[in-house]
Regions:
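A generic structural signal for short beta-strands and their flanking turns/coil linkers
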Residues: 35, 47-51, 74-76
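Short, well-ordered beta-strand segments in beta-rich or mixed alpha/beta enzyme
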Residues: 5-9, 43-66
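Intrinsic disorder/low-complexity signal
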Residues: 30, 49, 55, 68, ...
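Short S/T/G/P-rich N-terminal loop/turn motif that feeds into the first structured element of a domain
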Residues: 1-34, 38, 83-84, 88-107
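A short linear hydrophobic-aromatic micro-motif
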Residues: 36-43, 78-79
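An amphipathic, aromatic/His-enriched active-site/gating alpha helix that lines ligand/cofactor pockets
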Residues: 57-87
Length: 107
């Protein structure tokens, strides 16, 4: 399945909910799984985002629906990004012409 990065910021009552009910984060992970996605790993962050979640989802539509669903609760703001493994990215660059300059020379 494709990999996605979700950057989450608690808003509204989100911080209070996490403070009084820390296991809520694990409950959300179960909800993510229920829609066909898989949480690969999660980190609590310092800075402009509170959490980074790496997840796998069947397709863009599924992860977009998940993102909107979670954000609609009013406790979190989410930025979702598709992630491409670097090996796949490099392979794709080597296999196609680049902006009209012809194929990349193999070293």
């Amino acid at each position: 399945m494709p990999t996605y990065i979700m950057l989450s910021t608690l808003v509204g009552d989100g911080s209070q909910t996490m403070h009084s009910h820390p296991d809520r984060l694990l409950e959300v992970d179960k909800e993510v799984q229920a829609v066909g996605c898989k949480v690969v790993t999660q980190y609590a962050l310092l800075g402009m985002y509170d959490f980074l979640t790496v997840l796998e989802a069947p397709d863009n539509e599924t992860v977009a629906h998940l993102s909107v669903d979670l954000a609609s609760r009013g406790t979190v703001k989410i930025l979702t990004l598709p992630a491409i493994p670097v090996d796949s990215f490099v392979s794709k660059l080597k296999s196609h012409e680049q902006l009209g300059r012809g194929p990349v020379d193999a070293d």
